[in-house]
Structures are given as C-alpha cells and as structure tokens.
C-alpha cells in the first residue's frame, strides 16, 4: 500500500522511477511507494519534469502544484501535491485504474 504523509497540509508520497521506458505511466505499487515508468531519459531534468506532469494529470491539478521534494537525482523520490491532503490523494489513487491499488 502506498504511504501518504502530510507536510504543511500537502500530500507527500514516495515514487520509484524507471526512466527510458517504452511509455510513461504509473505501473502500480512498489513497496510503500508508486512505481512510475517514464519515456524521458534522466538528462537535464527531463525525467523529473515528465514525472511531475504525469502526477498532475493523475490527480487533476496544475503542473505547478506538483514538485519533487527529495531525490531529484535518484530513482527513489518524494513527490508533493500542493493543495491536496493525504486523504484526498489516497482517495483519488484508490479510484484510479492503476493495477494493484
């Protein structure tokens, strides 16, 4: 199960990224985090930007409200969703079509 934490009223959760994949998608749970496959290579912050865009679509919030708070140069990251509580984010994720959730 994906663990959500709250930091100053914003949802924060862990992500495991697999860059240079055939498609960009949320694959499912990875321990206490979400596994994400990204088409972008981890060069010039392209994979991080694509990761943020993917979560902005999934949670229906603007790109500017999704940020990587730790692990920008790592495959394991923490992502913050501004304006969504941990419970709201958990509910959206539960109602999504992502396998294994």
Swiss-Prot record:
Intrachain disulfide bonds: none
Recorded hits in InterPro entries, A to Z, give: DUF167 (IPR003746), YggU-like_sf (IPR036591)
Q: Which cellular components does GO assign to this protein?
A: cytoplasm
Name it: UPF0235 protein Plut_0338
The organism of origin for this protein: Chlorobium luteolum (strain DSM 273 / BCRC 81028 / 2530) (Pelodictyon luteolum)
- Top-level taxon in the UniProt lineage: Bacteria
Return the PANTHER family for the record.
Answer: UPF0235 PROTEIN C15ORF40 (PTHR13420:SF7)
Q: Which family does it belong to?
A: Belongs to the UPF0235 family.
A Pfam family annotated for this chain is DUF167
